[in-house]
Design a protein with these regions (language model features):
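Phosphate-coordination loops involved in phosphoryl transfer and adenosine-cofactor binding
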Residues: 1, 85, 181-184, 257
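Phosphate/diphosphate ligand-binding glycine-rich loop within oxidoreductases
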Residues: 70-152
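Adenosine-phosphate binding glycine-rich loop
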Residues: 119-171, 265-348
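Rossmann-like adenosine-cofactor binding region
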Residues: 214-294
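Short glycine-/small-residue-rich Rossmann-like dinucleotide-binding loops
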Residues: 75-76, 92-93, 236-241, 264-265, ...
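An N-terminal-biased, well-structured beta-alpha scaffold segment characteristic
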Residues: 2-107
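Glycine-rich phosphate/diphosphate-binding loop of Rossmann-like nucleotide-binding domains
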Residues: 8-44, 154-236
Length: 348
């Protein structure tokens, strides 16, 4: 019998979950054993999962889960260096040259574990079967707007908070923009899920948005147009061959650009298209000031959808559920492709 173990998230400001009570009910009905850990922060309460027929585990007890359990979470595990013996479904951030990713792969190798990276669950056409992209784009645009509004008032963006939904987030932004003009914004990757979410947020706030995608960046750069907007949102994942959108020279350039929202958030990747910063930012300090004359702030947070934890979890879980229903066949379909990706990278 397949045993799915849904762990509590241990990262600060992470309330999302990848399966809803309805999804658990579907797994239980299909004959799967499901354990859901208690969580002090999860946006969806344990009561719904219990009603769906799951077993309840102690918060953060996944290291002691049975050997055959498939441990399912979203964000990174504690960096304690211990070998990992289970099969893990999560966002590993381990295949694009990230230093922390190599550490994760080495821990899995040492313990005999396996990573089924959620970013690499793809169909036969190579497209991801589930993604938080829309919500990352929406929340990322909101944070960039907060950064710009703080600049306009002579400051820097303060700590972020979660919101009960898009309406609450937009109301918060509207209050911050009272008496302010609207900046010009450009999105690269505008046709994808992330870019669509970003554009929806900006449009809802009354901004004129320049939307670029592959056709507009095919020349390889340089891209002076990016520096001609007050806000730039990067919605393109770092990968080999990706052009540089903001070179290091932009720090000293004559530019309108004052806020970069790196929603893709791969600053430690060798292929990052933004060369003016080298580390992610956090909820408590969302803006990194990389230049002062003229000012330039970068915001790059890798769990943006947790600003809207319920909406983003429900949407993502619905996309992922058909694949979770095939966990009994880890040797086929999306799971086989994810395992091949893991095998290729762990062997390096």
């Amino acid at each position: 019998m397949v045993h799915l173990w849904v762990r509590a998230e241990q990262r600060a400001h992470e309330e999302r979950v990848g399966v809803t009570p309805e999804g658990v009910a579907a797994r239980v009905k299909a004959g799967v054993r499901v354990t859901v850990e208690q969580s002090s922060v999860r946006a969806i309460g344990i009561e719904g999962y219990v009603a769906a027929g799951c077993e309840v585990g102690v918060e953060n007890s996944w290291p002691d889960a049975p050997e055959d359990a498939i441990v399912f979470g979203l964000k990174e595990l504690p960096e304690d260096g211990l070998p990992l013996r289970h099969r893990h479904i999560m966002f590993g951030h381990a295949y694009k040259g990230q230093p922390a990713g190599r550490v994760l792969l080495d821990r899995l190798k040492a313990g005999g574990g396996t990573l089924y990276d959620l970013e690499y669950l793809v169909g036969e056409d190579g497209r991801r079967v589930a993604a938080f992209g829309y919500w990352a784009g929406y929340a990322g645009a909101a944070v960039a707007l907060k950064c710009w509004a703080a600049q306009a008032r002579g400051g820097i963006c303060g700590p972020l908070t979660r919101h009960d939904g898009k309406a609450a987030l937009l109301a918060d932004l509207a209050a911050e923009f009272l008496g302010l003009s609207r900046p010009r914004a450009i999105i690269i990757g505008a046709l994808g899920r992330v870019g669509t979410g970003a554009a929806d947020c900006l449009t809802a706030m009354g901004l004129a948005v320049t939307k670029w995608d592959m056709a507009e960046t095919a020349s390889g750069g340089p891209f002076a147009e990016v520096l001609g907007h007050e806000i730039f949102l990067n919605c393109i994942l770092a990968r080999p061959g990706c052009p540089v959108f903001v070179p290091a020279s932009a720090l000293r350039a004559d530019r309108a650009l004052t806020v970069i929202g790196d929603i893709a958030c791969d600053p430690t990747s060798d292929f990052s298209p933004i060369k003016v910063y080298d580390r992610a930012t956090e909820w408590d300090a969302p803006a990194l000031r990389v230049a002062v004359d003229p000012v330039l702030d970068v915001t790059a947070i890798d769990n943006l959808p947790s600003m809207l934890p319920v909406e983003s979890s429900v949407d993502y879980a619905g996309q992922l559920l058909p694949s979770l229903l095939t966990l009994g066949d880890l040797g086929g379909g999306v799971w086989r492709r994810a395992k091949l990706e893991f095998d290729r990278h762990v062997a390096v």
